Every structure is written in C-alpha cells, then in structure tokens.
C-alpha cells in the first residue's frame, strides 16, 4: 500500500531517485508504522530547504483567499488584465470607474504634456482637453489671445473704440476727453465733464440710472444730463440731445411748421417743468441744419443738427452724450439689447404731457422682426436702412408725442452713446406696434463734417446728404 502510494508520488513529482528508494524500502520489508524510521543511504523524503530548490514557485500572498476578498486594483488590473466590470467592483462608483478606464484602456493621453503655456491637461478616451490660463486659447493653449483679438469679437476687448487691419494687431482708442490707460484697452477721463458720464451717479458710485414715455419712470434729477427741451414761443416743441457744448441733435420733423425761428430756445439741465431750480440753462438756437434728402411730412432722414447761439456750461446736470464712431456704433452698440429713451412727452396716447422728465428702458429689434410683428396686426411700416425699431408690442410702454427728437442712449462699458433719435410710430404704445428711431450711425460723418465747417448765414439750412 505504501509502495503504491510512493510510486504514484514519484511519478507526479518526476523524481528519478525516488523510485529506486522505494524499491529499497520494499526489499527491506520495513514498515514505518511498526518501528521508527532511521536515516539511511537512500531517503524517500528530503528537507524543506532542498524541496524548495525543486518545487519553488512565486505565489501571491493569501492567494487561496483571492475569490473571497474584495477586488484589489493592484491585483486585478495591474498584475493581471481586468475587465470594466471588475474595475467597477473595485471603485464602487461609475464616474471614478470611467475616469480610470479611460486611462487604463488606451493609455494616458496627457503623458506627453500636450498643453502649452501653463495649461492643465485632462485625459479623455483617445483624446484630451487642455484648460488654458486666461491669456491663452487653442486646443493646446498655443495661441496668446492678444495675437488673435479682432474688433468684431467683443470690440476687441477695447473699452471704447477698436481698430484693426489685415496683418496687424488690433489697437484701442478713446473718445475725445478720454485717454488710453497703460493696459491698452481702458479709457480714463481727462476732463472734468467727459461725454457719456453721469456725474450724479459717479459721485454715488453707481453706473446706471434708476429706472415713452408711456409706462416709464421719472428720470431722477441729473441722471439724464444730456436731455434738451426745445421751446418755441415758450411752448414745448420737442426733445433733443446735447453732443457738445454748442451742438444739439434732434428730429427734422420737429421743424416742419416753424415760422418764428428767433423764438426757438433750447433748455439744458431741465427736470421738472413746473418749477425753476437754478440748474437750467437756456440758449437760443442759432441754426437748424437738416439733410437735403429729408422731405417735410415724411419719416426718412428724420434728423436735425442745431447750433446754439452760445456754448452751455458743463455741470453735474448738463453733460453731453457721446457721438460714437460709426463702425463702433454699427458693430458693437447696435447689438446692445436695451437702451434708454427719455422726454417730457404724453404719458398716454392723446393724454397729458409729463411735468417731470421720464425715462424708459427699451429693447432694440432687428428690422425683420419688427416688420413681422407689425404684419401680424395688419400693418406694413416702411422701415428703411436709416431707421430701427425699439420698444414693446404689448402696448405697455413707448415714446410718444412730445418725446420726438429725444435721445436713444446706449450704455457700453461705463459710457453712454447716442444711437437713435425718437422719430415716429403708430400712435403711442399701440398693441402690435413699436417705436421707430432714426439710426444715428448712418449720419455720423455728416454730423461731424457739419460741426467742423465754418458757420453759414441763415437759420434753416439744408446740407447735402450723404
């Protein structure tokens, strides 16, 4: 029995001397069960050290418990190839498993450090994402933003005016009365009363006014400092906008029926028509200039430039609105959603006029949207390229009679600009209709040329346009 077992063991172990030893044991007839075994010249068993020299193989610690223990990342996925399900058992979390599997299954795509200029890399499946520092952009953060800034993209980062030409870096400029700061994009005032600023708010560390003029609010005193009130024979005529100490912009249709030009007065710093508070300044209008293309009784080219008899004095309550450069107005200001209109017009259609200056925040519309909305109520207004629509179609808010000629003022990065002139509309705050404004950007060069030219005789002049 022992002999058979020994032979089987020898065969399994493949030991040549083992069988011979077995034969000796059998021949001697010794039974290990009956008497103690003594070492002899032929041994069946070897020492542990000798056995290890023949049978030794590497084993993982606790290998016999492998199926009983929770998964180990080292054991399952690094010593051996693991599956997604095995990795999921290890992490116990789908998101962490996905992050591991991306790197495990196709390698770390960030290993080559593809992100430049200090960018950080995030590994993805067969891809990667670079998170760039603020001054850089591109797939690998390889491009400095300053090298790619163009004026059509957020005004090139400029606070006011932007210029660029093919093959050159964009440059920022500032309006008259401002200077460019060292950062190359910001503008700072160089005069006490620069255009487009509201001194009352500046001193309160605020930036925008609180706030037709149907459904609007009272413009707090001093918060619409460029607003002009035009009077003829002492009666309210229209509104206007101060653009420097001697020039005012208004609507041409306001002067269709004027006969006594010497009684045309512009009032600055006005707020409440029922009282005089000492901040008002009155100037006689010396000249009214309208485009040669304007036809009385119509709405196209509805703009007028007024020269005052004497310059006004700039104060906290009398400040000009900036007349923007044309490209800046068309490329940037035209896409500012909301702007302010102001005036002392009727508070309701055919109602009483306002005693206090009113202001309203109105949204600007694309011309096509304006036409589509108007057609829904059976109207087909003639909106030319010299006009634009703004306001609300629900009949709640609008400019109205008496507001004509007043400003449509647009705020951009801390400064206000003249973008429109209150012109015409179908009634006041009529459902389905919008207010129509003269598009000032079309007349920038015309206005600037007239303001640079020598005064000509006459009160009402027609100047060639364009």
Curated annotation (Swiss-Prot):
Propeptide intervals in chain numbering:
21-60
Binding site residues for substrate: 398
Outcome of swapping residue 342 to G: In FA7D; results in severely decreased clot formation in coagulation assays
Q: What class of enzyme is it?
A: hydrolase
GO CC term, one of those recorded: vesicle
* Entries under Pfam families matching the protein: EGF, FXa_inhibition, Gla, Trypsin
Q: Name one GO biological process term.
A: response to vitamin K
Quick one: effect of changing residue 252 to V?
In FA7D; results in loss of function and lack of clot formation in coagulation assays
Effect of mutating residue 13 to P = In FA7D; Morioka
Q: Which residues cross the membrane?
A: none
Identify the tissues in which this protein is expressed: Plasma.
Domain of life, source organism: Eukaryota
Family statement drawn from the similarity comment of this UniProt entry? Belongs to the peptidase S1 family.
According to UniProt, the name of this protein is Coagulation factor VII
Species assigned in the record: Homo sapiens
- Classification of source organism: Eukaryota, Metazoa, Chordata, Craniata, Vertebrata
């Amino acid at each position: 029995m022992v002999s058979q077992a020994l032979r089987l063991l020898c065969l399994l172990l493949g030991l040549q001397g083992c069988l011979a030893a077995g034969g000796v044991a059998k021949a001697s007839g010794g039974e290990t069960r009956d008497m103690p075994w003594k070492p002899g010249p032929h041994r069946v068993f070897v020492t542990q050290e000798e056995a290890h020299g023949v049978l030794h193989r590497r084993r993982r610690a606790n290998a016999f418990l492998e199926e009983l223990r929770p998964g180990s990342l080292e054991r399952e996925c690094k010593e051996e190839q693991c599956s997604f399900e095995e990795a999921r058992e290890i992490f116990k979390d789908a998101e962490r498993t996905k992050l591991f599997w991306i790197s495990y299954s196709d390698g770390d795509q960030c290993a080559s450090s593809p992100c430049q200029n200090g960018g950080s890399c995030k590994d993805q499946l067969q891809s990667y994402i670079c998170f760039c520092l603020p001054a850089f952009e591109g797939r690998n953060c390889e491009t400095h933003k300053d090298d790619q800034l163009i004026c059509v993209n957020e005004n090139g980062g400029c606070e006011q005016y932007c210029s660029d030409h093919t093959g050159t870096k964009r440059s920022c400029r500032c309006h008259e009365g401002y200077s460019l700061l060292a950062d190359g994009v910001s503008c700072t005032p160089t005069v006490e009363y620069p255009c487009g600023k509201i001194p009352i708010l500046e001193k309160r560390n605020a930036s925008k006014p609180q706030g037709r003029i149907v459904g609007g609010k009272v413009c707090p005193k001093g918060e619409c400092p460029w607003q002009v009130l035009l009077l003829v024979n002492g009666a309210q005529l229209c509104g206007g906008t101060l653009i420097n100490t001697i020039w005012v912009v208004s609507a041409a249709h306001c002067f269709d029926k004027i006969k006594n030009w010497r009684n045309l007065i512009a009032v600055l710093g006005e707020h409440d028509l029922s009282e005089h508070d000492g901040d008002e300044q009155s100037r006689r209008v010396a000249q009214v200039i309208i485009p040669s293309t304007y036809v009385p009784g119509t709405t196209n080219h509805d703009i007028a430039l007024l020269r005052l008899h004497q310059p006004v004095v700039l104060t906290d309550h009398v400040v000009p609105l900036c007349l923007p450069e044309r490209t800046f107005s068309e490329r940037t200001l035209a896409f500012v959603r909301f702007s302010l209109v102001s005036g002392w017009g009727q508070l309701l259609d055919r109602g009483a006029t306002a005693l206090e200056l009113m202001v309203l925040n109105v949204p600007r519309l694309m011309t096509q949207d304006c036409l589509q909305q108007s057609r829904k109520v059976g109207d087909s207004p003639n909106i030319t390229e010299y006009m634009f629509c703004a306001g609300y179609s629900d009949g709640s808010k609008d400019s109205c009679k008496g507001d004509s000629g007043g400003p449509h003022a647009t705020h951009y990065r801390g400064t206000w600009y003249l973008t429109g002139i209150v012109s015409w509309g179908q009634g006041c705050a009529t459902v389905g209709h919008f207010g129509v404004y003269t598009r000032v950007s079309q007349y920038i060069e015309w206005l600037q040329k007239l303001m640079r030219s020598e005064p000509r005789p006459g009160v009402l002049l027609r100047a060639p346009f364009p």
